């Protein structure tokens, strides 16, 4: 029997499809989401409905985003869900989540078993709509969750860690083995909850500047900051900001990156 076929659907590699089948894990995720009627609940990648069904039982209506037309068509005729669902057959990377929140007149509660092949770019896309989202609960590759929660000084700490922790409180929920899926992925998974801050602990005046310096620093993570960020500020500037110019990207905290971004933004304004 082909292990890529589940409930009559052939799992498509190009969409990174692995279907969750473990009832204990499903129940744990639904309890951590704790959906309530009337909330603006959005599921990304409902697949065959492993999470959609138990969440849908608690909701009067919900929205799902599904790129696979065959899976979207199955949901359209689902016996218990079809009258509750708004199905957006579209790539989640192209969705304006702020517009969805505006249409629903409240912040969104987003969840899903995210395709591992797009999980990191999708996280960055969602962070850009953090003000329109009340919380996010995702199944991700365990390695990605480790990066989301990593502290500065660790090898897993990177640009994703900085941007996630700038925008959100990040809470790991549960680890999930490959045997919980069909077909079984080659990696371990984990569930994480991200709660966008209503007031950022370290506000920045220009998020594009924070994005720029973290990209520049972590794209050359083996270099010292004196070299990776040397085109933006001098070693003396770094010392004035209490940052060691001989340190590497992973040794700088979220707060310090925010401080550098704000300083560079203010320098830019003065130059203008």
Curated annotation (Swiss-Prot):
Entry EC number(s): 2.1.1.182
GO cellular component: cytosol
Highest taxon of the lineage: Bacteria
Residues the record lists as binding S-adenosyl-L-methionine: 18, 20, 45, 66, 91, 113
Enzyme class: transferase
Keywords: Cytoplasm, Methyltransferase, RNA-binding, rRNA processing, S-adenosyl-L-methionine, Transferase
Lineage: Bacteria, Pseudomonadati, Pseudomonadota, Gammaproteobacteria, Enterobacterales
Catalytic activity: adenosine(1518)/adenosine(1519) in 16S rRNA + 4 S-adenosyl-L-methionine = N(6)-dimethyladenosine(1518)/N(6)-dimethyladenosine(1519) in 16S rRNA + 4 S-adenosyl-L-homocysteine + 4 H(+)
A single MF term (Gene Ontology): 16S rRNA (adenine(1518)-N(6)/adenine(1519)-N(6))-dimethyltransferase activity
Cell compartments where the protein resides: Cytoplasm
Designated gene of the protein: rsmA
Protein name: Ribosomal RNA small subunit methyltransferase A
The keyword S-adenosyl-L-methionine belongs to this UniProt entry's keyword annotation: yes
Keyword Metal-binding: no
Family designation: Belongs to the class I-like SAM-binding methyltransferase superfamily. rRNA adenine N(6)-methyltransferase family. RsmA subfamily.
Primary residence: cytoplasm
UniProt-listed InterPro entries: KsgA/Erm, rRNA_Ade_diMease-like_C, rRNA_Ade_Mease_Trfase_CS, rRNA_Ade_methylase_Trfase_N, rRNA_adenine_dimethylase, SAM-dependent_MTases_sf
Role this protein plays: Specifically dimethylates two adjacent adenosines (A1518 and A1519) in the loop of a conserved hairpin near the 3'-end of 16S rRNA in the 30S particle. May play a critical role in biogenesis of 30S subunits.
């Amino acid at each position: 029997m082909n292990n890529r076929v589940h409930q009559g659907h052939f799992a498509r590699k190009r969409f990174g499809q692995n279907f969750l089948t473990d009832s204990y894990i499903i129940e744990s995720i639904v309890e951590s989401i704790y959906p309530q009627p009337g909330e603006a609940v959005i599921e990304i990648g409902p697949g065959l409905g492993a999470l959609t069904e138990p969440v849908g039982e608690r909701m009067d209506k919900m929205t799902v985003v599904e790129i696979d037309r065959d899976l979207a068509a199955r949901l359209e005729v689902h016996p218990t869900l079809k009258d509750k669902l708004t199905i957006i057959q579209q790539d989640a990377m192209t969705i304006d989540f702020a517009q969805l929140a505006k249409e629903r007149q409240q912040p969104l509660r987003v969840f899903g078993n995210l395709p591992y092949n797009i999980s990191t770019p999708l996280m960055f896309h969602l962070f850009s709509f953090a003000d329109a989202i009340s919380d996010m609960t995702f199944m991700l590759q365990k390695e990605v969750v480790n990066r989301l929660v990593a502290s500065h000084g660790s090898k897993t700490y990177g640009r994703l860690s900085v941007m996630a922790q700038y925008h959100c409180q990040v809470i790991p929920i549960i680890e999930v083995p490959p045997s919980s899926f069909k077909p079984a992925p080659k990696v371990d998974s984990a569930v994480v909850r991200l709660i966008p801050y209503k007031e950022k602990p370290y506000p920045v005046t220009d998020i594009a500047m924070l994005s720029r310096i973290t990209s520049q620093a972590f794209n050359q993570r083996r270099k010292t900051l004196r070299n990776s960020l040397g085109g933006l500020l001098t070693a003396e500037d770094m010392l004035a900001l209490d940052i060691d110019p001989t340190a590497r990207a992973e040794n700088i905290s979220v707060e310090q990156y925010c401080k550098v971004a704000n300083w560079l933004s203010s320098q830019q304004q003065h130059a203008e």
